[in-house]
Amino acid sequence: MADEAIKNGVLDILADLTGSDDVKKNLDLNLFETGLLDSMGTVQLLLELQSQFGVDAPVSEFDRKEWDTPNKIIAKVEQAQ
């Protein structure tokens, strides 16, 4: 999958989960500090990433610091491809 397709797919997932297009405008937005993503949203995010991109990121190994911005999430998905 092309990087642009991954980026757009991740941003669409984040926009749906957060209910905000801010995630598409500011790729360095801290999703947790802004309250756009919480623990339940995190579980939904990981399930969507696994379903759409085959990313296997167990909740038990999830580190918020590594997944706290759209850019970091996109990078994680690209690494898993």
From Swiss-Prot:
Gene3D superfamilies per UniProt: ACP-like (1.10.1200.10)
Domain of life: Bacteria
GO molecular function, one term: D-alanyl carrier activity
O-(pantetheine 4'-phosphoryl)serine PTM sites in chain numbering: S39
Domain named Carrier: residues: 1-81
Localization, UniProt: Cytoplasm
Post-translational modification: 4'-phosphopantetheine is transferred from CoA to a specific serine of apo-DCP.
Pathway assigned in UniProt: Cell wall biogenesis; lipoteichoic acid biosynthesis
Family label: Belongs to the DltC family.
Name of this chain's protein: D-alanyl carrier protein
Organism encoding this protein: Lacticaseibacillus rhamnosus (Lactobacillus rhamnosus)
Upper lineage: Bacteria, Bacillati, Bacillota, Bacilli, Lactobacillales
Gene name for this UniProt entry: dltC
